[in-house]
Amino acid sequence: MASLIKEFKKLKVFLPKRMRELLIPSDEGFFDTNYRYPAPGSQTPPDITNKQFVKTRPLTRVYKFLKKRGEVLSLRKQPTLDAPTENLTAEEKAEKLFYETEPYPLTAPRIKDNKVFFHNIKAMEGFDIRNVRSINKNISKIENEFGVPIDRKVLRFEESEIDTDEPLPKSTNNLF
């Protein structure tokens, strides 16, 4: 066997380098330290379509772990924010307002049943929006005098003289 390997090593010179690496074992064996698997460019990108999300721990467990390390002061809500609002200072009221109101109010899910949808709108608006006459009669509840929906908050301001406080007439040069 040893003589066979010697013969192989003599023939090594005549073989192309890649073939040499594949067929003739080096001192370290077939796959020596120079061997790169897979060859550069031949590896397909990993298939991630079937991967599942890793199930994360419940937040209470995470908090308990952090609390043991001393990174969470308390799992309970801060008592200042739980307290009734009349006992709070102005700063605490601002904090309460900031932390306890939703940053973006969520839109209600769309009602797919038209009957229920229009019943709810009639209850909110006070008139039937499917009837053209009732819309014309109650247009002031829907739009302001400029045709903007009433629930749209529009910045309206009056400009006036500084000294006399007389309102300036609206013109294109003093409108933003």
Curated annotation (Swiss-Prot):
Protein name as it appears in the record: Uncharacterized protein DDB_G0283843
Domain of life: Eukaryota
